[in-house]
Curated annotation (Swiss-Prot):
GO terms for cellular component: cytoplasm. The gene is queF. It is an enzyme of class 1 (oxidoreductase). Its EC number is 1.7.1.13. InterPro entries: GTP-CH-I_C/QueF (IPR043133), NADPH_dep_7-cyano-7-deazaG_red (IPR050084), QueF (IPR029500), QueF_type1 (IPR016856). This is NADPH-dependent 7-cyano-7-deazaguanine reductase. Residues 1-30 are annotated as: Disordered.
Length: 154
């Protein structure tokens, strides 16, 4: 087992305020101690919040991010703060979902990444957004994201 070098991180182990916006949020990475081995990392944010850009009302989603790392892993505290930065950010569901994925791809250059964003209904219609970088490498176990389709009270 190896210890990861965290010397270059600016947020881990310190008190950090929630960033003002996703654009100002600092995503950080750490070396992947298992580079060269294909495996899936999953982050789940069941209480993701952003704002409707038209009404300013809150929007809620259950977000699942799966990725197969290359040389780097996302540092989880920086990811948490990045996701929290959407709380006061107005954007459509699709824009939030794809922006999250593209920021992670830009930072990590993973072998593969997908996001499933399961948005709770607004105007009676749930919106689910799915995006991925391409086909996953063969032979990697990709579990279902485990989020049932929205059924309301039915």
């Amino acid at each position: 087992m190896s210890v990861t070098d965290v010397s270059g991180l600016s947020q881990l182990g310190t008190k950090v305020d929630t960033p003002e916006s996703p654009e100002k949020a600092v995503l950080e990475k750490v070396p992947n101690g298992n580079a060269g081995t294909d495996y899936v990392v999953r982050f789940t944010a069941p209480e993701f919040t952003s704002l409707c850009p038209m009404t300013g009302q809150p929007d809620f989603a259950h977000i699942v991010i799966d990725y197969i790392p290359g040389d780097f892993l996302v540092e989880s505290k920086s990811l948490k703060l990045f996701l929290q930065s959407f709380r006061n950010h107005g954007a459509f569901h699709e824009d939030c979902s794809v922006y999250i994925a593209k920021r992670l791809v830009e930072l990590l250059q993973p072998k593969w990444l997908r996001i499933g964003a399961y948005w709770y209904p607004r105007g009676g219609i749930p919106i689910d957004v799915f995006w991925q970088t391409g086909a996953a490498p063969e032979g990697v176990w990709l579990p279902d994201q485990g989020v049932a389709p929205y059924r309301g009270r039915g």
